[in-house]
Structure formats: C-alpha cells, structure tokens
Amino acid sequence: MSELASFKTRKENFLKSIISKNPESINKYKRVVASPIRYPGGKSLAVGYIVELLPINIKRVISPFFGGGSVEITISKYLGLEVIGYDIFEILMNYWNIQIEDPELLYEKLKEIKPTEENFNNVKAILKDHWEGKIKLDPITLATYFFFNWNLSYGPGFLSWTSEIYLNEKKYEKMIERVRDFSPGNLKVGSADFRDILKKYPNDFMYLDPPYYIGPNSKVFKGIYPQRNFPIYHKNFPHEILRDMLKEHKGGFILSNNNCPTIRKWYKDYKQFFPKWQYTMGQGETRIGKNRRNAKSTYIKDSSEIIIFSPPKNKRRGVLNKV
C-alpha cells in the first residue's frame, strides 16, 4: 500500500471510529480526549470536523497556536503524520516539552503533590514569582507546577483560582495517569511567535487555532489567554497580520475562529464550514455566569465556530489538492 493510500485509510478509519452514536446529540463526532491538559477553547469536540478536511497527501502539519493540542496530538498519534507545534506562551510549551520527552518523570513529580487547596495556593504563589521574574524555576519543576495549577483551576487558566471539583484524589490520580501514559507519536514542540513560524514553513500545511477575534458582532467579548485577568496573548492580537500572511502561504491551511461577520468577510475567498456541537463549560464545570442566568441558559453551550480551509498551492513539491 502506498504512503498516500495508507494515510487515506487511517483517516477514514479514524473518522468512522469517532462518529457519535447518541441520537439525542447534535454532535456529528464524539469528543476526542487526546490531551492530558484541560484547555479553554480546546478543540476536543472539533477534532473530527478538522480531520475531515486534511488533504490526504500531506506529510506533516505545522501548528503555530498549539494550546491544548487536541487536534495536533490526534494527527500525530492516530493519523501517523509528523506534527510540529508552537505557541508564544513559553511556560505552556516548557510543560509540553517535558510532557513529550519524559512523561514518567513528570508523573512522579506530580504524584508528590496532594490535590489540596493549601498546596494549590502554595504552587500558585511560586508560579507567580516565576512569572514576575522574582525566581527562576528549573524546567521540570516549572512543568510540574504549571500542570498542577492549570489543571486544578477553574476555566482553566494560568494563575487562576481553584476549582473544587478537581481537588479530589481519585480524579487527580486519573489525571496524572494520563500524564504518565502519554504517547503522542511523532510530535515536536517549541515556543515562537506565529509570524516567525509562517515565515519558517512557507510550503507546509498548517492548522491554526489563534485567539478568537474580539470585536463588533463577535460572541467573544473578553480575552482569556493565558488568563482572563491578564489576557496578554489575546488582547490586541494582530488578526489582520495573520490574515495577510495566510493569503501568501503556499502550503495550505485549516483555520479555526469564531463565526462572526468580520472573520467571514476577511476569509470570503476560502471554503468556510460552520460545524455545530454542544459542550459544557470546563468539561465538568456546571457553574454559569450572571449573563447566562439572566438569559435562562444552562451550562450546555452551542458552538459558534467557523472552520476555514485553503488547499495547498505548492505543486512544485507534488502536493495535490485532495481532501
């Protein structure tokens, strides 16, 4: 079987395996839990829709906005492609590097910390000192404390407040067992600005999940990366620069964003898809905010997503525009 046919078969088999069998669900595909970390805006329910669009003859995928990595890990683990992921949040990518290179050591370090509110507050204080440059943690300790703070927080969010439902030893043990057993396939990570990555890989296929657009007629009204109280990677994100650079990108791409008039207009020359799914906030959190209470909404939310697809343009390397 040729390499192209092999990837096509893996893709088809994977999509069949995640078809939702729940007749009451609007979700076409089941949630794919590939990442050890919870992530705001994570794509565990979008994996199937994105995999559908992957051209069958690409050899690797570049991700400039790695985040929680659900899509990227799925592509490397289940589809067998090389994936290189980047993110501007260095502390996050330090965690990912340790998670990939030494999951058992990370597990042992996490096992030493009990999931109590006292430990959460102590770890948060140390992480805050590192973030503010008062101390410098070694990579292993930084990865350990990041995971503990992040995965046990509400949201989740960096240096966020604790979530009681995760201060549970059984849940915590299952959580860190996923750290220990993590095996993502051919996945590499680094920390960089998306502009540098688009310049570095002009002919590679990309999956991009940037901070969602905040503006008129957008359902996203506040930045959340790395935390809603200091969204330095979200506020004033240069969406216009990303748009203009993607126009020149030859390798093809899939872009996720929020479905709003501005994004639809900016990318009107590309194929646009509007998948629908339902998700619960925090994948376990059932608290709802004042706005949703006033609107008599539940903690179950409908997606408002747009997925934009541009096939590879670079025929010089034998890339065919097949999906």
List each model region and its residues.
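Short aromatic-enriched loop/helix-cap "lid" or pocket-rim segments at secondary-structure transitions
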Residues: 95-98, 159, 219-220, 267
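SAM cofactor-binding core of SAM-dependent methyltransferases
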Residues: 52, 57-127
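Phosphate/nucleotide-binding beta-alpha loop and adjacent structural elements of enzyme active sites
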Residues: 101-149, 153, 259-264, 280-295, ...
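Catalytic metal-binding/acid-base residues of hydrolase active sites
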Residues: 89, 211, 259
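Class I S-adenosyl-L-methionine
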Residues: 1-84, 192-205, 215-221, 230-323
